[in-house]
Regions:
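Acidic, surface-exposed loops and disordered segments
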Residues: 1-131
Length: 131
């Protein structure tokens, strides 16, 4: 994470925080998948200003991409997940997330038994147009 936080973020707000939950530390947290060895919850500041909110969210996902690339170097698999319970204030309180923050994503962490085959990316030239 120390390297992943070198993500671009406007005005250096660094809007992220992290909660690490290991497989053996999930008592009362039945909403996590038991087959996933660990989870990293990435939270971000709630902003009433839509511009700041979008900037913060973009910065958080730049950080997540950095983390995924760095983890892959160590053969650690990272799956970015979104769950209904992320938006449940009761769950957030149970996880100790303050009212002024929200969960941006849950990273499911583990080592692959088999390396998944890479899927081909779509052709970028089909996704843009010239005005």
């Amino acid at each position: 994470l120390n390297h992943a936080v070198w993500a671009p973020n406007h005005r250096l707000r660094e809007p992220w925080k992290f909660i690490y939950i290991a497989n053996d530390n999930r008592e009362g947290l039945e909403f996590f998948h038991k087959q996933v060895p660990a989870h990293l919850i990435v939270t971000m500041k709630n902003e009433s200003d839509a511009y700041k909110h979008d900037e913060n969210l973009a910065a958080v996902f730049c950080l997540i991409q950095n983390f995924k690339l760095l983890a892959w170097e160590k053969k650690l698999g990272v799956n970015v997940s979104f769950y209904d319970w992320m938006f449940d204030r009761g769950v957030c309180q149970k996880l100790g997330i303050p009212e002024k923050e929200r969960i941006a994503a849950v990273l499911d962490l583990g080592f692959y038994l088999e390396i998944p085959e890479a899927k081909p990316a779509s052709v970028a030239s089909l996704k843009w147009r010239l005005l």
